[in-house]
Every structure is written in C-alpha cells, then in structure tokens.
Amino acid sequence: GMKGSYLSMSGRDAVFSATSSDSGNAGTVTFDSGEWYAGKIVIDIEGEVAYDKIAFEGKFNKTGNINDMALEFVFDGYSMNEFINANGGEFTLSDVITYETGSSMEGTVFEGNTNGFAWEAVFGDTALSVTFTVPEPAEISALLGALVLAIAIIRRRK
C-alpha cells in the first residue's frame, strides 16, 4: 500500500481515505505518525477481511475537538446485513486504524448510523475497533410487542 511520513488532518471540510472514496477498492496506507484536528476519515468496507486500513507506526494524536471530526463508512447494505447475521447480530472490524500505545486518540468514541446500520467506533489502546449492528427492527418489534400486550391486558380488564 501507500506509505507516508506524517498525516495531519486539520480542515473541517477535509476528507481522507486510504483509497479514493469512490473507487470501490479497499486498501492500506501506512504513516510514521499523525494527528487529527478536524475533518472526516472515510473507510471503505468491501468484505469481512477486505476494508480500508490506516496504520500509524508511531502515535496518532487527537489535537482538535471531536465535534469537528467525523468517521464515514462506505459499504454495500446487503453485504453488511450478511456479515452481521453471520456473526451473531453484530459485525466488528478490530484494526481499521492502528497506532502506538500512548496516542491521545485513545478513549475517543464515535457513534453513527449509515443506511440503517448503527455503528460504534472506539479508539482503544492501539487500534480503532468498529462494531456494526441492526438495532431498528428488533427495537420496533419489541415496542409493537409491548403495545399488543398492553392492548390485550386492557381488553381483558373490560
């Protein structure tokens, strides 16, 4: 993959992707170190093992405010649904962005929803781990079930 010395993301409208965000190819890019002040990182997910990876051999530091940062995931909804179902209701990518211990990105958490798939991205000790789930249908059916039960109880009391 590509190799760079230092990645500095600082523009609020800046977008970075390991491959061009519209190429439909997943790839890896490696940097010695980097910092994230603002802007968006786009991760392309092609498969369970084929997805964009950003590797920092050294530290990856948060130098700005999380409100100016964003993560975006690009994937095929049908495939993502398959990955989630095949993995017991959630699909996790554990090494999307890797870095050295002691990086100030550690502890940063992003949450979002892409095409109906909820995701949580957690920057841990040495890597970003992203978990995808499909919360909506289960929550909706639980609410409908509770509503039907409540109506049945009310009718029985009459």
Label for each model-derived stretch:
Residues G1-E90:
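Extracellular beta-strand/loop-rich repeat segments of large surface/secreted proteins
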Residues K40, E46, T63-V134, L147:
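Extracellular/surface-exposed low-complexity segments
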Residues E136-I154:
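A short, hydrophobic C-terminal helix/tail in secreted or cell-surface proteins
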Residues K3, F16, S20, T28-V29, ...:
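Short stretches within intrinsically disordered, low-complexity N-terminal or propeptide regions
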Residues Y51-D52, L93, E139-A142:
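Intrinsically disordered, low-complexity segments enriched in glycine/proline and serine/threonine
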